[in-house]
């Protein structure tokens, strides 16, 4: 028989050649093979489609983060919390939506830069359920996450403002004695004074929830001047107060929580009789006349004047300062979001 050469390879087929590498088998197409080109084209199309889907998913996520809505939060019994005074808890869909709108308005005017913690705090207020669980720290209005906290702060954390207030101690005490001249227990409360929840507890505000009480400031010019010299005094949002605080003997202020962990409350002792005590986060402390005590009042705290009537009242000057770890852009945004009357 005559020799027959092998048939020539066809160009319209796929030559499948297995190349074993470990446990994998690769299928290669011969150049010019139509099926191989089709498979390569299909693989490229799948890759492009996958990348496009991932890009769309990322864009959707960014949109949701920027415009996300907070799920409604309710009272433990299912009743939405009351909207109104910022001292009350900010749980509740309506209030959280208002905070979101305020944050977005601020970011449009200025920038989203540095707003990550604020965004997270507003978004997760309902998740924290601060008003529904027992805790040693439970701010009643706004909680800023990832903020270092302790019941008491060292003097060095607010050295400049502490020194200003302590140097002003004689003038502040003198002005207190002037406004308290007509103050007598049991008598009608003099002008400018406020009776708090406990009848033995009175306050004289120079700033109340971020608003200056002009008449009271005019009555205490040196104290007002000292406040104006402070670098971290909160004077533009509803978390900021400055006042003379008076407790009569036998008065006990039961455990309460402050509205936010973004502030540090500075207590300057003016008159501290025996038997006066402050307990914050389970840690007791005593005031000293002429010296400042820095407190995070978002922790559970109680105040008591256990002295006798002959000891006279306890008098503390209080000024709310920014927490040292709240950054400048965050402070500006909080002033905008929690502006008085907003």
What is each PLM-predicted segment?
Residues 246, 270, 305-307:
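Short, low-complexity Ser/Thr-rich regulatory SLiMs
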Residues 253-256, 277-279, 295, 301-309:
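Short beta-strand His + acidic residue motifs that chelate non-heme Fe in jelly-roll/DSBH
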Residues 286-300:
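Conserved metal-binding segment of the jelly-roll/cupin
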């Amino acid at each position: 028989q005559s020799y027959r050469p092998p048939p020539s390879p066809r160009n319209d087929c796929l030559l499948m050649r297995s190349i074993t590498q470990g446990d994998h088998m690769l299928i290669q197409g011969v150049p010019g093979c139509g099926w191989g080109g089709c498979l390569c084209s299909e693989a490229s199309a799948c890759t492009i489609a996958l990348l496009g889907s991932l890009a769309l998913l990322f864009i959707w996520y960014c949109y949701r983060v920027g415009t996300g809505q907070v799920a409604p939060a309710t009272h433990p019994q299912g009743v939405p919390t009351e909207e109104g005074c910022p001292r009350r808890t900010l749980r509740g869909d309506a209030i959280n939506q208002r905070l979101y709108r305020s944050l977005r308005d601020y970011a449009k005017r200025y920038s989203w830069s540095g707003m990550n913690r604020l965004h997270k705090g507003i978004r997760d207020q309902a998740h924290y359920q601060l008003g529904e669980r027992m805790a040693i720290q439970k701010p009643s209005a706004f909680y800023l996450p990832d903020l270092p906290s302790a019941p008491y702060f060292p003097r060095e954390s607010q050295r400049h403002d502490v020194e200003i207030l302590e140097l002003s101690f004689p003038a502040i005490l003198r002005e207190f004695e002037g406004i308290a001249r007509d103050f007598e227990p049991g008598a009608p409360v003099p002008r400018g004074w406020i009776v708090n929840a406990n009848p033995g507890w009175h306050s004289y505000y120079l700033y109340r929830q971020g608003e200056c009480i002009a008449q009271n400031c005019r009555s205490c010019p040196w104290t007002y001047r000292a406040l104006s010299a402070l670098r971290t005094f909160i004077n533009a949002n509803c978390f900021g107060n400055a006042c003379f605080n008076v407790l009569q003997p036998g008065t006990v202020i039961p455990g309460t929580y402050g509205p936010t962990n973004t502030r540090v409350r500075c207590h300057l002792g003016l008159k501290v009789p025996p038997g006066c005590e402050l307990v914050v986060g389970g840690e007791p402390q005593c005031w000293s006349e002429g010296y400042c005590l820095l407190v995070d009042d978002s922790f559970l705290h109680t105040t008591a004047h256990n002295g006798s009537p002959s000891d006279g009242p306890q008098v503390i000057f209080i000024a709310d300062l920014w927490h040292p770890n709240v950054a400048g852009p965050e402070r500006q945004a909080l002033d905008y979001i929690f502006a008085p009357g907003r």
